[in-house]
């Protein structure tokens, strides 16, 4: 090897999509419509406009902290809800009280914490408000009967996400949550249960 030869070392950031472990489905009784019904009395926005705003909450990256009550009661759908540390539902990251106490300082700059009460148990919904910039050349759509059903491959631009702990995608309407190794390690070092990490690139 000649001394004057230059080599570029390319390091590709590993990205994981965060999913519910074993695809357990919803564990709490809420959806966009029920939450709209619960919150419409806290805003002066016209009902029809507020409904659209709430259904597009994650895609539009809106905040609802200013209309969220101190604590919102939500009923469980699963008897095992209190055994989950961290979960994904309706585009929110669901945190147990213990997971919230641990992750608060890491996630505070990335979104807002919405406190809920589930049968007397304090839990928190985290509304992520940070997007990652997709690498459109590597996001290949999968079509079924002429309609986009999913993506064959998905990727983000490394320079945009390499300093982001947690982020979402505009192409997925803000519903999918993604992370790099740092967040994954935060979860694993405390053995927080309820989610799994699936590498996308």
Where are each of the predicted segments found?
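Phosphate/anion-contacting hairpin/loop surfaces
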Residues: 1-201
């Amino acid at each position: 090897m000649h001394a004057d030869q230059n080599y570029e070392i390319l390091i590709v950031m590993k990205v994981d999509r965060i999913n519910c472990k074993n695809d357990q489905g919803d564990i709490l009784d809420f959806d966009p419509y029920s939450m709209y019904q619960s919150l419409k009395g806290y805003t002066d926005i016209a009902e029809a406009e507020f409904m659209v705003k709430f259904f597009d909450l994650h895609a539009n990256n809106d905040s609802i902290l200013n209309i969220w009550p101190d604590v919102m009661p939500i009923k469980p759908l699963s008897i095992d809800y209190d055994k989950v540390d961290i979960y994904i539902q309706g585009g929110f990251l669901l945190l147990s009280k213990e997971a919230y106490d641990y992750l608060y300082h890491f996630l505070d700059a990335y979104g807002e914490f919405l406190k809920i009460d589930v049968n007397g148990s304090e839990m928190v919904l985290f509304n992520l408000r940070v997007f990652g910039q997709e690498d459109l050349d590597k996001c290949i759509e999968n079509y079924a009967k002429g309609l986009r059903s999913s993506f064959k491959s998905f990727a983000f631009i490394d320079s945009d996400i390499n300093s982001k702990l947690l982020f979402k995608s505009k192409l997925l309407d803000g519903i999918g949550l993604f992370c790099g190794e740092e967040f994954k390690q935060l979860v694993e070092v405390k053995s927080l249960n309820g989610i799994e990490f699936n590498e996308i690139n």
